[in-house]
Amino acid sequence: MNKPLRNSHPLFKIANNALVDLPAPINISSWWNFGSLLGLCLIIQILTGLFLAMHYTADINLAFYSVNHICRDVNYGWLLRTLHANGASFFFICIYLHVGRGIYYGSYKFTPTWLIGVIILFLVMGTAFMGYVLPWGQMSFWGATVITNLLSAIPYLGMDLVQWLWGGFAVDNATLTRFFTFHFILPFIVLAMTMIHLLFLHQTGSNNPIGLNSNIDKIPFHPYFTFKDIVGFIVMIFILISLVLISPNLLGDPDNFIPANPLVTPAHIQPEWYFLFAYAILRSIPNKLGGVIALVLSIAILMILPFYNLSKFRGIQFYPINQVMFWSMLVTVILLTWIGARPVEEPYVLIGQILTVVYFLYYLVNPLITKWWDNLLN
């Protein structure tokens, strides 16, 4: 009997094993939709970004006006730009929910998949930061100045590293040009890393909401989960387009409508909303180098999760105290996001410091509580 083309063609076979005949656990919930939603976000960002790059000019005298030109003169340029800017917000919403799902259900036990995922998170954050600089508004310029300046905290190499990154003695034309270059290339690197992420995931198969081995009870990915994913696509695209058409600048910063001026500092420099929790952690450490280390650790600490796994069950579905701690940590991150947008004054500074300690404590106390709970049940 002849095999279907999808099983015999060397190229189609790869896609078939990843998207059609992939055995998937029968009980995975909507929390497992965010992986495919992230793929959709990445495709939207690459396509809209490609068309924006055709009309954008990476020059400090022209960048702001080229973005203005895109919005005013290019056919549907306003739509491309607002889709791209708000698409980034949706990308981060999906990433944070995806990571949160991974922490809750113990998906970090797939060590290589998890580590690649954290690297992808770092790459996406770098891409988004550089993209924010490109319109060359006030917040773009000052955000770039403040964040790149953090590298000067590195002992011995700091200042040289900053000047090398800037391509001069200040954020200038060379900085904008290289940021545009990296902003263009990084999404394709993210795409390649995503392939590796999936490759590692498909070695082990997906986790599921009860955290048990589901090999005896699996169903093909298509049609069951392809349709389930399409429902997720429709919901996300509906919300994204509603935001883009009703309030496209809701998540942006008003300061970025002012062309960059090195002589005027904005009253309150802050990044986009999806970086505010990390920015609050950075600001809560009085020492510059300490702040930079805390900033990097706020994401890098996710990498330690696979290595200190002490629990008998996968995930925290069966650990009530850990569930309370998990949701408390989520509230902590939301409060840190709020603090990051507040001015540097009391009581915000103290609240930020307390929340930072609580945030990092979660990763240290959580495995100990699971161990204690397991001993209690013995």
UniProtKB/Swiss-Prot annotation:
Residues annotated as binding heme b b562: H84, H183
Annotated heme b b566 binding sites: H98, H197
GO cellular component, one term: respiratory chain complex III
Entry annotated with the keyword Cell inner membrane: no
Subcellular locations according to the entry: Mitochondrion inner membrane
Keywords: Electron transport, Heme, Iron, Membrane, Metal-binding, Mitochondrion, Mitochondrion inner membrane, Respiratory chain, Transmembrane, Transmembrane helix, Transport, Ubiquinone
Highest taxon above the source species: Eukaryota
Cofactor annotation: heme b
Molecular-function GO terms, alphabetical: metal ion binding; ubiquinol-cytochrome-c reductase activity
Membrane topology: Multi-pass membrane protein
Leader peptide range in chain numbering: none
Cofactor: how and how many bound: Binds 2 heme b groups non-covalently.
Binding site for a ubiquinone: H202
A Gene Ontology BP annotation from the UniProt entry: spermatogenesis
Regions that span the bilayer: 34-54, 78-99, 114-134, 179-199, 227-247, 289-309, 321-341, 348-368
Function: Component of the ubiquinol-cytochrome c reductase complex (complex III or cytochrome b-c1 complex) that is part of the mitochondrial respiratory chain. The b-c1 complex mediates electron transfer from ubiquinol to cytochrome c. Contributes to the generation of a proton gradient across the mitochondrial membrane that is then used for ATP synthesis.
Similarity comment: family membership: Belongs to the cytochrome b family.
Miscellaneous: Heme 1 (or BL or b562) is low-potential and absorbs at about 562 nm, and heme 2 (or BH or b566) is high-potential and absorbs at about 566 nm.
UniProt cross-references to PANTHER family, sorted A to Z: CYTOCHROME B (PTHR19271:SF16)
Quaternary organization: The main subunits of complex b-c1 are: cytochrome b, cytochrome c1 and the Rieske protein.
Listed name of the protein: Cytochrome b
Organism of origin: Drosophila melanogaster
